[in-house]
């Protein structure tokens, strides 16, 4: 395991070094739009491997958003500053006051009214986590009046499952760990989220399992505050380059994610 992790880190480093010239250097105006404070402040949701996971022993951070944000900062020639949040709701609320410059989040038409987005960089499967011994064995068992579904409030999964589940009862928590706690304590029968989060959290709940199948896909993209058109244009080209160079595939593999695919080129 340690050898595999070292190898993926080495490959990622080579990709980043080898692709140094793939994106044209930004104009001063584009750099200012991306990093008006002189640093690229990248908003990241903790305990979400699509954003960032921190090793409790070493303190090392990994995750698709963390690695891509760090690389974008390197390419535009400014320091990388991760800005960490416990939930996507807190992340988005903080962005309204200008606390960050870019974020890697689920795309939706509602969010596009508040933020500018690049083309998609990830397609992420939704799924369900059930505890050991659960009578819920298939996705078809979930949408019933007696089934309580834990979700992180204001998240993409919250929006998706609220729209698609017609009979189940929702138990909303302020964060993914909070939704897991509802499942652990018996306040919920199943947790709905994106599969990378579910697989990560399942490590904390022995004998739990992620149900087979996928009820839907959560599209993810880079988001920026509105009004920074030159910055969004540069970030959009960075995302396309990262897809074509194999960089996004490499950061997915480094994070060991399941249920995630690189989005098609624009």
Q: What is the role of each PLM region?
A:
Residues 23-25, 30, 156-173, 210-211, ...:
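Ligand-binding clefts/hinges and TM-proximal coupling segments of bilobed small-molecule sensing domains
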Residues 66, 70, 74, 79-143, ...:
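Acidic, polar ligand-binding/catalytic clefts
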Residues 25, 63-75, 133, 140, ...:
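Extended ligand-binding regions for polar small-molecule ligands
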Residues 41, 77-79, 96-105, 146-148, ...:
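Alpha-to-beta junction loops
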Residues 46, 122-132, 195, 199-240, ...:
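Periplasmic-binding protein-like
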Residues 25-106, 245, 254:
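Extracytoplasmic small-molecule ligand-binding "clamshell" domains
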Residues 41-49, 58-75, 107, 127-180, ...:
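Bilobed "Venus flytrap"/periplasmic-binding protein-like clamshell domains
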Residues 89, 106-114, 160-161, 184-216:
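A ligand-binding cleft/hinge motif common to bilobed small-molecule-binding domains
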